Amino acid sequence: MTIFKTVRIAALASVLAGGTISAAGAADVVRHSEPGSHFPISTAIEVPPGATTIYLSGMGAPPVDKAADPKTLAAYGDTETQVRGALTRIQGELAKLKLTMGDVVNMHIYLVADPKLGKIDFPGMMKAYTEFYGTPAQPKLPTRSAFEVAHLANPGWLVEIEVVAVRTH
């Protein structure tokens, strides 16, 4: 009889531990920022156990001038326009997955030098980026890296963005 009591206690402990793990899995994502910094990125992010990670493929902007050759800059606009377009596309893809821009924890932005400027347009990128992040409506900031690259798959693109999002349960 003692052995059956031990098995029941072990089973009960296992069930209770499972409940504890589930509760821990429902924890929030923790975002860390540099103290006193107003730069709209997180310096580190902690993802709770049990969260699902979603990787979105890199996305460029949709054409803004459909009459222009789709392999030219004229079809997609400047850096600011392209970042806004790419982030809007990402927002749409996340929505299909029942996620928001606030669920993004990591972002890589690949930038090609704007031929009109002779360099990447970091201020233009930031202007469009801050329409989506660090706003009162959407204050959750991802970790982010921005890279200058020689070119992208579409010769008309100045920007390609890929993100990682998490879904907490």
Per-segment meaning from a language model:
Residues F4-T88, G92-V105, D114-H169:
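N-terminal presequence-like segments and the immediate start of the first folded domain
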